[in-house]
């Protein structure tokens, strides 16, 4: 299980590197577009622009994949933690069986206290696991926060992005992402129904 966790984290890092490389390539292509336009060569600029868009989309896809792999790594980490808690609970149960068979009230009381403590720890771990799984399952952040961050960065760099943000469909972080959003909403509802 630990090897799986390591491999998932390693894969997520590789995907993030690929996303950065694609973004760098996109920026290079955009510089070529600018140069071609300065030379009044629109056809060449169009080819470079297509390359820039393709590379940008490729980078976004790598980044989405990295995010999903990271979410799976979080789930595996939670499973490893729960495995340890379960092992501790099994040990306490065995100790309780031994104490009950000898009927030594002091031992029974001590084991019951330890068992209560383990149950409380399990409740805390379960709560943390549910919180991390719900955040990992949705794979989204509130749209308002995303928009605010984009506006903040744009203002810091003197960029105009409000028109572009207004063109995106409500609740989507990029064009063509509404089907992904629907799937994520369905997964969130299923997770909520499993909790109840």
UniProtKB/Swiss-Prot annotation:
Positions in coiled-coil regions = 5-41
| Name of the protein in question | Charged multivesicular body protein 1a
Q: Which organism is it from?
A: Xenopus laevis (African clawed frog)
Q: Which residues cross the membrane?
A: none
Keyword Coiled coil applies: yes
Does the keyword field hold Protein biosynthesis? no
* Topology class, membrane: Peripheral membrane protein
Query: What exactly does this protein do?
Result: Probable peripherally associated component of the endosomal sorting required for transport complex III (ESCRT-III) which is involved in multivesicular bodies (MVBs) formation and sorting of endosomal cargo proteins into MVBs. MVBs contain intraluminal vesicles (ILVs) that are generated by invagination and scission from the limiting membrane of the endosome and mostly are delivered to lysosomes enabling degradation of membrane proteins, such as stimulated growth factor receptors, lysosomal enzymes and lipids.
Q: Where does the record place Polar residues bias?
A: 170-181
Record PANTHER family: CHARGED MULTIVESICULAR BODY PROTEIN
Tell me where on the tree of life, at the top rank, the source sits: Eukaryota
Q: Which UniProt keywords apply?
A: Coiled coil, Cytoplasm, Endosome, Membrane, Protein transport, Transport
* Cross-referenced Pfam families: Snf7
Location within or outside the cell: Cytoplasm; Endosome membrane
What are the start and end residues of every segment in region (Disordered)? 170-196
The record ties this protein, via InterPro entries, to: Snf7_fam
Predominantly, its location class is: cytoplasm
